[in-house]
Amino acid sequence: MALSEAAVKVQAALLERGLETPMLPSVYSSEERKDKIEHHMKEILTLMSLDLSDDSLADTPRRIAKMYVDEIFSGLDYENFPKITVIDNKMGFDEMVRVQDISLTSTCEHHLVTIDGTATIAYLPRKKIIGLSKINRIVRFFAQRPQVQERLTQQVLVALQTLLETKDVAVKMDAVHYCVKSRGVMDSTSSTTTTALGGIFKSNPATRAEFLHQ
């Protein structure tokens, strides 16, 4: 299946900036990946002394394989990049467009546990305007990978800058990391905030403040 024009542009922009998720070219189909993950997951669970003949566990390796490929790591495959609707800004709209409280669930690439949070996105329209739901879908696409929050924030910024043909984009993410909450230090109250600012959001203090403190 050929990649969409939007997917090709975004991937190229991330590679150029050194912001692409570290990954190898895939040599397997989705079903082949599921079969191999299922096989190895059986070995892992058996090494953990779990009895896979039990009704509750028998299908767990396959469920995990399907979850990895079709859901929580589906953003590793650019064939899943969302269909993007970008239109010419014929009405000359030039005020800030802001979408806040976008829910995101990702996976920490260090321990493969949950990152749970929200994103706020803003841009100043220039030549192009994007369908609002597409912003949410772009966040979700890049969240559905093993991630670090700093890179995720930058990936969403670059994707929107590329598609909107403007640097004037800002991204803010607030998230709870379960690698901190459920293991290690086991801090159940802390959260992490990251920002990525481009164009006027970086150069103009008033615009930056409006985005960050609204």
Swiss-Prot record:
InterPro entries: GTP-CH-I_C/QueF, GTP-CH-I_N, GTP_CycHdrlase_I, GTP_CycHdrlase_I_CS, GTP_CycHdrlase_I_dom. Zn(2+) binds at residues 108, 111, 179. GO terms for biological process: one-carbon metabolic process; tetrahydrobiopterin biosynthetic process; tetrahydrofolate biosynthetic process. Pathway: Cofactor biosynthesis; 7,8-dihydroneopterin triphosphate biosynthesis; 7,8-dihydroneopterin triphosphate from GTP: step 1/1. PROSITE patterns: GTP_CYCLOHYDROL_1_1 (PS00859), GTP_CYCLOHYDROL_1_2 (PS00860). One of its GO terms (molecular function) is GTP binding. The keyword Hydrolase applies. Coiled coil: none annotated. One of its GO terms (cellular component) is cytoplasm. Its EC number is 3.5.4.16. It catalyses: GTP + H2O = 7,8-dihydroneopterin 3'-triphosphate + formate + H(+). Gene3D superfamilies: 1.10.286.10, 3.30.1130.10. Keywords: GTP-binding, Hydrolase, Metal-binding, Nucleotide-binding, One-carbon metabolism, Zinc. PANTHER family: GTP CYCLOHYDROLASE 1, GTP CYCLOHYDROLASE I. Belongs to the GTP cyclohydrolase I family. Toroid-shaped homodecamer, composed of two pentamers of five dimers. This is GTP cyclohydrolase 1. The lineage of its organism: Bacteria, Pseudomonadati, Pseudomonadota, Gammaproteobacteria, Alteromonadales. The gene is folE.
